[in-house]
Structures are given as structure tokens and as C-alpha cells.
């Protein structure tokens, strides 16, 4: 048990991604149509979706820039680090 706890703590620190960003995209239960962004852990990019306006989860950002900042996504336009 202690081994698993240590493993997950090390894995979390080594990947350095906000846990909210790993949540699945959730449109929520209501029927509004708010354009939002979520972090897609498969593509490792922030992608657009339509949010229903209530419930959902924390992987829900008003702008793509906010999503990229919180989830650590580098913009394709930013220079690469050496």
C-alpha cells in the first residue's frame, strides 16, 4: 500500500499536470450552449466543446489560453526550449 502511494506521488510530480486537467470532458446536465475548452489527455491539447451551463467538472475553461496555462500546454506558436 505504501509503495502504491509513493508511486502515485512520484508520478504526479513527474508529470506535473493539474489533476483537474485529467478529468473527462463533461458537458453538464443543462441545455445552455456555452463554448468552452477542456484538456484532452489523449491528444494532449485543449479542445473546444459546448458546455450545458451546470454541473460538469473542473476540466472546463472559458478560453483556450486559460486551458493551456492551467494544464501546461505549450502553444504551437511558442518557441521550443533547448
UniProtKB/Swiss-Prot annotation:
Disulfide bonds join 21-71, 30-54, 46-67. Its main location: secreted. Residues 1-16 form the signal peptide. Coiled coil: none annotated. Gene3D superfamilies: Pancreatic trypsin inhibitor Kunitz domain (4.10.410.10). It comes from the Eukaryota. The record marks 31-32 as: Reactive bond for trypsin. Residues 21-71 form the BPTI/Kunitz inhibitor domain. InterPro entries: Kunitz_BPTI, Kunitz_BPTI_sf, Prtase_inh_Kunz-CS, TFPI/VKTCI-like. Dual-function toxin that inhibits both the serine protease trypsin and voltage-gated potassium channels Kv1.2/KCNA2. This is U-actitoxin-Avd3k.
Amino acid at each position: 500500500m505504501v509503495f502504491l502511494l509513493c508511486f502515485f506521488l512520484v508520478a504526479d510530480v513527474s508529470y506535473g499536470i493539474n489533476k483537474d486537467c485529467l478529468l473527462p470532458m463533461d458537458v453538464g446536465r443543462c441545455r445552455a450552449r456555452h463554448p468552452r475548452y477542456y484538456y484532452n489527455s489523449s491528444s494532449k491539447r485543449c479542445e473546444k466543446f459546448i458546455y450545458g451551463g451546470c454541473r460538469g467538472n473542473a476540466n472546463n475553461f472559458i478560453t483556450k489560453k486559460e486551458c493551456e496555462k492551467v494544464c501546461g500546454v505549450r502553444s504551437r506558436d511558442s518557441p521550443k526550449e533547448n
